[in-house]
């Protein structure tokens, strides 16, 4: 028999999902950060949180491609302490883990693959 407090997935996964949503929500509110993130702000794609929850790897993507990835990562990392403070005010967690920002290149690889597939010759109609 399941208890009403049973969760469908582990606490770490729930916290990682919550952190992803909340980091995305606080980015526009960071003081002085908007100039470093314009013209298009990053999208938070995933948060990886180990079972001990002592650190969080925050993956982000950019709508305009990877050219600004290093610059944006530096801006985000420079504001990681401020982001943690804002998260601490918003979330009922005992401790907000240190945040480490990493560019998520999965979407770039997907776009490259779509481009390659678009340039393939059409398949022959009759196959033996």
Swiss-Prot record:
One of several proteins that assist in the late maturation steps of the functional core of the 30S ribosomal subunit. Associates with free 30S ribosomal subunits (but not with 30S subunits that are part of 70S ribosomes or polysomes). Required for efficient processing of 16S rRNA. May interact with the 5'-terminal helix region of 16S rRNA. Monomer. Binds 30S ribosomal subunits, but not 50S ribosomal subunits or 70S ribosomes. GO terms for biological process: maturation of SSU-rRNA. Its main location: cytoplasm. One of its GO terms (cellular component) is cytosol. It comes from Acidithiobacillus ferrooxidans (strain ATCC 23270 / DSM 14882 / CIP 104768 / NCIMB 8455). Keywords: Cytoplasm, Ribosome biogenesis. It comes from the Bacteria. It is found in: Cytoplasm. The keyword Nucleotide-binding does not apply. GO terms for molecular function: ribosomal small subunit binding. This is Ribosome-binding factor A. The keyword Cell inner membrane does not apply. Pfam families: RBFA. PROSITE patterns: RBFA. Belongs to the RbfA family.
